[in-house]
Amino acid sequence: MCLDRCFLWRKKRKQRLLEKLIPSAKDGGAAIFAPFYCEYGVNIHFGKGCFVNYKCTFLDCAPITLEDGVWVGANVTIATPCHPFLSDERLPQQYPDGFHDLEYAKPIHIGSGSWICSSATICGGVTIGKNCIVAAGAVVTRDVPDNCIVAGVPAKVLRKLDEQDRMQVWDTYMKNEVPMSERERGRK
């Protein structure tokens, strides 16, 4: 299903289609920007306050679960399908109803508060812990513990997140700001 052709002036229609495709997207479960691609939709489960940026692909042959507050950057692929490693096992086999290739799927679970940055790929069978960051372009093939930053191909844990990572908004951005009333008068 592609929501690419559902323009902003059809916002209600887009939301109805999305809720039909992904029932957990109802009631604030997710904000999803088009285009969005998925295989089935019914195997995708959103917690509250999830955000999915544009051009994401969710191949949901098995369940994909995003807990509360998960952010997914642009062009991310979350793919549950897996294929055999050996080439002769990947070849289509003849069955009574025709030729088929061997494919199986493993679920993916992403913990609350995690952020999957742009162009990352999450492979089947992976569990990403709570409050994790998956760096842009990373390919996650193994489980990620809570409160970690992972990056690379394949993704590896760079370090644990801690209190020193907390953004100091006042010190960083507001310290040298001039109050609005003085700025309007042109004074510093």
Q: What are these regions, as identified by a protein language model?
A:
Residues 36-46, 51-127, 153, 160-162, ...:
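Flexible, glycine/small-residue-enriched loop-and-beta-strand segment within the central core
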Residues 93, 148, 170-172:
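A generic membrane alpha-helix/interface feature
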Residues 1-29, 85, 153-188:
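Terminal amphipathic alpha-helical/low-complexity segments used for targeting or macromolecular assembly
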Residues 121-151, 155:
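C-terminal/domain-terminus segments
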Residues 29-35:
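Arg/Lys-rich RNA-binding interfaces used to dock onto structured RNA substrates
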Residues 23, 35-36:
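Aromatic-residue hotspot detector
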